[in-house]
């Protein structure tokens, strides 16, 4: 093998190695990304049912139902236009309460019931997760346009 052929083979091997590393990195990133949806998008059927997603909105007043004897809880989440039911088994954050903005992570189950694996509550009275605030603002604007 001449020097030129060895150099060409080395360049090809480096390109193949970088391509494989890039492909594996993109695949890992794609599997770990969680898309954000609001209740209107969920009820419209715009949400994949086979992957984990995040849903955000405001907990509907009077909708929180806890089962006695275990940690199961069910509540409704709204973006002021549509409402989706969320079921969760576990300890809710201390700041979780009705009328407050939350983000839940999980999968969409049968009958458009969201099965949460994690629930995140807002931090103080002024804070609302940016995705939830944007979603509520868009929904409010769309609702006002229709009136």
Curated annotation (Swiss-Prot):
Keywords: Cell inner membrane, Cell membrane, Cytochrome c-type biogenesis, Heme, Iron, Membrane, Metal-binding, Signal-anchor, Transmembrane, Transmembrane helix. Residues 29-147 are periplasmic. The chain crosses the membrane at residues 8-28. Its main location: membrane. Heme chaperone required for the biogenesis of c-type cytochromes. Transiently binds heme delivered by CcmC and transfers the heme to apo-cytochromes in a process facilitated by CcmF and CcmH. Belongs to the CcmE/CycJ family. This is Cytochrome c-type biogenesis protein CcmE. It comes from Nitrosococcus oceani (strain ATCC 19707 / BCRC 17464 / JCM 30415 / NCIMB 11848 / C-107). The gene is ccmE.
């Amino acid at each position: 093998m001449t020097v030129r052929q060895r150099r060409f083979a080395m360049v090809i091997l480096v390109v193949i190695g970088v391509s494989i590393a890039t492909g594996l990195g993109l695949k890992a990133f794609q599997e770990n990304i969680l898309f954000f949806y609001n209740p209107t998008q969920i009820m419209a059927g715009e949400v994949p049912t086979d992957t984990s997603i995040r849903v955000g909105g405001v907990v509907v007043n009077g909708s929180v139902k806890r089962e006695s004897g275990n940690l199961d809880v069910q509540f409704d989440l709204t973006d002021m236009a549509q409402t989706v039911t969320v079921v969760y088994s576990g300890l809710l954050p201390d700041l979780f309460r009705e009328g407050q903005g939350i983000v839940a992570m999980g999968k969409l189950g049968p009958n458009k019931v969201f099965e949460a694996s994690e629930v995140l509550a807002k931090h103080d009275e002024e804070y609302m997760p940016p995705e939830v605030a944007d979603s509520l603002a868009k929904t409010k604007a769309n609702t006002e346009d229709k009136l």
